[in-house]
């Protein structure tokens, strides 16, 4: 099994050819496209509708047999005037170029605008090249990252889109009609991190607009910038709308982060001025909900911090049990639980620690979040197949039930977890 890494962090050492781009000059949007079965036909449709001067780079990651003949660049070059290049290690990406992952590659990553390849070991671990690349794309390009999931039969890609959306990028999935193989896009959609569900032609049209939108010229997260006086006033109006509609005050949040989320929403609605977006918010209450969800940035996964889980089992749980009698109550509160993955991870870890002793204990795990949509999903306890990357086969078999749409947490774990809407900054704690 591949060792679980911390979310969105890739241990890649820069080569001598790597040069970190300056604040804005060398940054341009990069579109990561993931697919498997039936993808070439749909990608061709996207190419035919795609302008040649978007100033974007396109990087294609697909599931192919390592023995597959390397003809993809030649086949794709017939459909576009953009240069189509097979990705190679240490290659600097350029605007208006298409890069294709070679079939023998296990993983393709992007660091400081440079491609890195790791050869695919035969028959080892789950093969998730789309997730791996999209996570690196999110880390490298942040709000300049765009993720597209096309036709395919697998569960790869959902976690990669989550990473892109969390860093302020924009995400697409191909609509089921006329998608020949819909497993990959449907799994991504079910995970809840897709901004647009469109046909290949519609995706190309939307990309053409987004390419020149000011949102993508916003500096990266590690570049400091301050909101202007006008932006400060406009932010106050938006905060007031959200406070009246939802009851949450975002005044104390980092302005740069908030501005990125707002400008992301503006790009999606093709609005160039903040004043126009404020008017749009005033006349579209549903958009206030969408902006609220965007601001919360629900980044989570099962067992996302393996070291923390091990510390609970080795240090914290033994202390709790030591303080209890043979028959006692264990109560745990997990605030900001998002869609429930971390709360269920703690519950599973506790069950593993207790073993047969679990039957003698009364366990109550309270999990809370301000996001009603996230709490609703946590209560359903159904997750896409992409969790196979984070949950080992033994845990999947013992604590999950296989469903057509993915996996559901088993009844025993669900019975000890209570989810509630709660603002940890304003509401009193659980007694």
Model-inferred region functions:
Residues 1-293, 307:
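Conserved acid/base catalytic micro-environments in cytosolic active-site loops
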Residues 22-26, 322-329:
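Phosphate-binding P-loop
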Residues 29, 56-57, 145-146, 328-332, ...:
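Residue-level recognition of the N-termini of beta-strands and the immediately preceding loop/turn
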Residues 251, 269, 276, 281, ...:
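Class I SAM-dependent methyltransferase Rossmann-like catalytic core
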Residues 304, 334-336:
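Class I SAM-dependent methyltransferase core
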Residues 335, 356-431:
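Extended basic-aromatic, gly/pro-enriched interface segments that bind polyanionic ligands
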Residues 339-357:
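Conserved SAM-binding loop of SAM-dependent methyltransferases across substrates and taxa
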């Amino acid at each position: 099994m591949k060792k679980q890494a911390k979310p969105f962090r890739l241990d890649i050492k820069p080569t001598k050819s790597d040069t970190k781009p300056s604040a804005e000059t060398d940054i341009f949007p990069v579109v990561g496209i993931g697919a498997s079965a039936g993808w070439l036909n749909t990608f061709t449709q996207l190419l035919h509708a795609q302008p040649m001067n978007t100033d974007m780079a396109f990087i294609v990651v697909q599931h192919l047999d390592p023995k597959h003949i390397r003809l993809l660049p030649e086949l794709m070059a017939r459909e576009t005037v953009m240069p189509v290049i097979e990705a190679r290690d240490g290659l600097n990406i350029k605007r208006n170029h298409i890069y294709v992952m070679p079939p023998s590659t296990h993983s393709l990553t992007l660091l400081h605008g440079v491609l890195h390849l790791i050869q695919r070991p035969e028959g080892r671990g789950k093969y998730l090249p789309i997730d791996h690349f999209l996570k690196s794309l999110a880390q490298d390009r942040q709000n300049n990252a765009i993720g597209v999931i096309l036709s395919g039969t697998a569960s790869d890609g959902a976690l990669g889109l989550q990473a892109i959306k969390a860093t302020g990028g924009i995400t697409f999935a191909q609509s089921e009609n006329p998608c020949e193989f819909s497993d990959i896009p449907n799994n991504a959609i079910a995970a809840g991190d897709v901004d647009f569900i469109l046909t290949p032609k519609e995706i190309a049209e939307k990309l053409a607009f987004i390419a020149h939108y000011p949102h993508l010229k916003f500096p990266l997260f590690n570049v400091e910038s301050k909101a202007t006086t006008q932006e400060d006033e406009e932010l106050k109006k938006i905060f007031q709308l959200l406070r009246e509609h939802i009851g949450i005050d975002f005044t104390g949040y980092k302005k740069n982060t908030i501005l990125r989320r707002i400008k992301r929403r503006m790009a999606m609605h093709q609005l160039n001025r903040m004043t126009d977006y404020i008017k749009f918010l005033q006349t579209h209450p549903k958009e206030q909900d969408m902006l609220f969800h965007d601001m919360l940035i629900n980044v989570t996964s099962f067992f996302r911090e393996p070291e923390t889980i091990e510390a609970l089992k080795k240090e914290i749980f033994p202390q709790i049990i030591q303080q209890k009698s043979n028959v006692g109550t264990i109560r745990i509160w997990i605030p900001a639980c998002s869609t429930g993955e971390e709360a269920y991870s703690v519950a599973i870890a506790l069950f593993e620690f207790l073993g047969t002793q679990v039957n003698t204990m009364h366990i109550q795990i309270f999990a809370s979040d301000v996001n009603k949509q996230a709490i609703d999903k946590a209560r359903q306890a159904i997750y896409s197949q992409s969790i196979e990357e984070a949950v080992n086969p033994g845990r999947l078999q013992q604590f999950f039930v296989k469903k057509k749409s993915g996996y559901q947490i088993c009844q025993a774990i669900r019975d000890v977890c209570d989810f509630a809407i709660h603002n940890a900054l304003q509401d009193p704690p659980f007694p």
